[in-house]
Amino acid sequence: MSGYTVEVDKRRTFAIISHPDAGKTTITEKVLLFGQALQKAGTVKGKKSGQHAKSDWMEMEKDRGISITTSVMQFPYREALVNLLDTPGHEDFSEDTYRTLTAVDSCLMVIDSAKGVEQRTIKLMEVTRLRDTPIVTFMNKLDRDIRDPIELMDEVENILNIACAPITWPIGAGKEFKGVYHLLRDEVILYQNGMGHTIQDSRVIKGLDNPELDEAIGSYAQDLRDEMELVLGASHEFDLEAFLKGELTPVFFGTALGNFGVDHILDGIVEWAPRPQPRESDQRNVEPDESKFSGFVFKIQANMDPKHRDRVAFMRVCSGRYEQGMKMHHVRIGKDVNVSDALTFMAGDRNRAEAAYPGDIIGLHNHGTIRIGDTFTQGEKLRFTGVPNFAPEMFRRIRLKDPLKQKQLLKGLVQLSEEGAVQVFRPLDSNDLIVGAVGVLQFEVVVQRLKSEYKVEAIYEAISVATARWVYSKDAKKLEEFKRKCSNNLALDGGDNLTYVAPTMVNLNLSMERYPDIEFAKTREN
């Protein structure tokens, strides 16, 4: 086996998905702790303690205790090299999360065991279904009072339509949480309270019938034996093939805050989750074992380092090996670029990448030429598909407090729209600037970032826009006629793409009927 294949086989690239507040950022912290990347994990709540969670690294996230942007972290675990993408749990940032899920080979789904399956989890699972992404499940918060574990698994099976195979099973919960039984290893791992910031050196008791178990946990031992008979009869056995097809999920129980059960998940991901997978392009499927380099950009982040006022494009490597100083072909603009300063990430800590392999995420410095969805190759004219921009659902007019700063405002808005967090539209026949977003929180984020990063103070005003659609036509004459007749509803987005800005849904439907040769698109790929 070649050294290249060994490197590809080692990679595990996954994202964590959950409903807000299910404990996703805490799990990210603990996963890093096991990867020896952090000696003492920061907690998300109690932000005044100064020990902020490592993956929530933008100022605004630190203030609010929510993850707004996708963080990327790489760390070794056992014989694997893990690339973990932490996605925003907050609802308004679903586009960012959606695009992140195009860059991973498996997902860890985190569920709050007191609440069960929640709305956001359902939506995210629909996205993973599009590519049959394998899912590992973690039932979190066992150190609190929880719902019945069998009931929780039934809910996952019925609502998310995926079979559950328990790998670990909880013994007690809340103040009486004693630990878990590992079904595949036939061993009980005991929980120690108050070890949330360090790796627990847990006591392990081999075998359900071991008398040591009765000594250690008293009557819970017999309850566990009785329960296991029921569980084994009522649940699925783990089946690797079904897992890889996205039909079955291994289920682990634990508490991220108490740092218990996280290593069990990591063991499962390293053992079962797939190596980097082939990727679809407009020409063919690209295999990870191909020698020529290729990759696509799924995210752009401005001002990762306020000291440098920079923008970084996050690229998933799909095939070949990145080497410092190599020449890449930027397919959309048809230019070759030399890349000598790509970055690897430890959540905001950036290091220069010496080399990168399929499954790795590298950062390219972006001076305004790279867009979300762009493909880079070693010359081949192919384009990876499936990294969309979505039409926003909410709109506001944005206005300056100081009219002399129009230039800075436009620059800031265009850069923020390149990140895909919001979209900016410039109407063809007015000087207005319209901001479009998926949710209200995004509007707040934009005003705050304009102020802190671009020194521009802006306010919003209501505007009668119901929706926007990107417009195209194969018939250039018909497009010109459409532009002439509908100019008061047309705008250019941040990438200068023609967009129809509809005041009402009725107006949009009438226009679509009136102009059958014009395509009104809800999504757009670069």
From Swiss-Prot:
Any GO molecular function: translation release factor activity, codon nonspecific
UniProt keyword annotations, A-Z: Cytoplasm, GTP-binding, Nucleotide-binding, Protein biosynthesis
Subcellular localization: Cytoplasm
Gene3D superfamilies for this protein: P-loop containing nucleotide triphosphate hydrolases, Peptide chain release factor 3, domain III
One cellular component term from this protein's GO annotations in UniProt: cytosol
Main localization of the protein described in the UniProt heading: cytoplasm
GO biological-process terms attached to the record: regulation of translational termination
InterPro entries linked: EF-G-like_DII, EFG_III/V, G_TR_CS, P-loop_NTPase, PrfC, RF3_C, RF3_dom_3_sf, RF3_GTP-bd
Residue span(s) of domain tr-type G: 9-277
Residues binding GTP: 18-25, 86-90, 140-143
Cited function: Increases the formation of ribosomal termination complexes and stimulates activities of RF-1 and RF-2. It binds guanine nucleotides and has strong preference for UGA stop codons. It may interact directly with the ribosome. The stimulation of RF-1 and RF-2 is significantly reduced by GTP and GDP, but not by GMP.
Similarity comment: family membership: Belongs to the TRAFAC class translation factor GTPase superfamily. Classic translation factor GTPase family. PrfC subfamily.
Protein name: Peptide chain release factor 3
